Each structure stands twice: as C-alpha cells, then as structure tokens.
Amino acid sequence: MLKKYNEWKESLPGVLATILDWVEVFVIAAAIALFMNNVIIANSQVPTGSMETTIEVGDRVIGSRLAYTFGEPKRGDVAIFKFGWKCSVCRYAMGEAPAPEICPYCGQKITHPQTVYYVKRVIGLPGDVIEIKADGSCAQTDIVSEARESVMLFGTEASKPLVTAAVYVNGEKLAEDYLREPMLYTGDMKFEVPAGSYFLMGDNRNNSLDARFWNNHYIAKEKMIAKVLFRYWPGIKAVK
C-alpha cells in the first residue's frame, strides 16, 4: 500500500507533490504531539495561587505521565490530577463525583460539564494517618501576611492569637521547607488515607482549597495524571 501511495505521489505535478509533503509533515507532527500529550507528558496552566511560591499564578508546567503509569506517586511530589467537574455556566468546580444535571451553586442545567485538573503536593500515601495540629509557635506578623490576621480560612476561623500548625504523618512531624509561610492553626484535623488513594495540599497553605476542605478528601490513583517536572513559562524552572 505504501509503495502504491509513493507511486501515486510521484505522478502528481511538482506543486501538488510539495503541498502533499507539507501535509504529511503536519499530520505526523500532530500525531506525535497527540501521543506525547496523552501518553508521555501532561501540559497544564496553574490558574490560582494555591501553590505559591513553588508555582505562581499563570505558570505553565510540564508533567510526566509515565511517572504514574509505571510507578506510584511519592510523598512530596507536585502532581497534576483530575479533581472532578466544572459547571459550564458559572464554572463552579465540583468534586470527584459525576457531574449533576443541575449545578448546586448557580442552579442552572449543566449541559457540557468540563473536566477540572488541579496541581497540588502529595502529602499522604495509601494507609497514612495525616494529622494537623498546633505546633505551639505564635505566628509573627513579619512572617504571616497581615491580610491573614483576621482571615476566615474557607469557613474555619484561625485561632487568636494566631498560632502556627504542622502536619504529622503517622505521628511524625513533616518537614515542609517549600511552604510559602507558616500554616495557621484552625483546629485539629485527622485524615486516614484509604488504600489506592492520596491526600494532597497546596504549598500556599493559608490560601489553598485543598484536601482538608473537599467533601471527598482523597484522590484515587486513577485520577493522578502526572508528576510535575518543570515550569516552561514564564522561563524554565525545575519544580520540586
């Protein structure tokens, strides 16, 4: 079949043969790009500041799909994952459950629900017990931004005077040198990560709507899309 195609192409006038050559190049390039984006890499733009300063608003990042196809997510990974659905009318994001017919936020019929992808850091692995507790340190205004001194963190009031909190994994305090600022204490929390699932949080801990506040706190393995490797716009920067 390929031989017949080449013979047919050689019989075409020069201009048509040249055009066909270019068409072949574009088709092959598109096929390679499609394969790369669906099998090997994941390309994502970060719309919020929940991962600052590791990843800034508007950054574009590249992740490796192969990392989670042939391996397991590791604690500390910055991951791209499928969170759920977004209303096609008001763009309200819903969790992992199938998109409802009516948006619970705007009350409009959802005709074309959009898949929502988030970027967060893996904190809890299957079987882990994650606890968030006060660590006994007072949050200083030169460390915690003044705008958060009287903040309501997603409906949970921060302690007054402000006290910082820490994450404990299976009873041991987690070292988190990637945090933008100390996490404010909003009350004790405890999560037991089920088998085949993961617990993820944002690095900008005081401004991140993450697993602490989702109705379903855990992301199933099949929802984990890729491990973020680097930012490619604006400028190239490794993401750790």
Task: Identify the function of each model-found stretch.
Residues 48:
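A short acidic/basic microdomain associated with nuclease active sites
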Residues 2-20, 35, 39, 44-45, ...:
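Soluble "head" domains of membrane/secretory-pathway proteins
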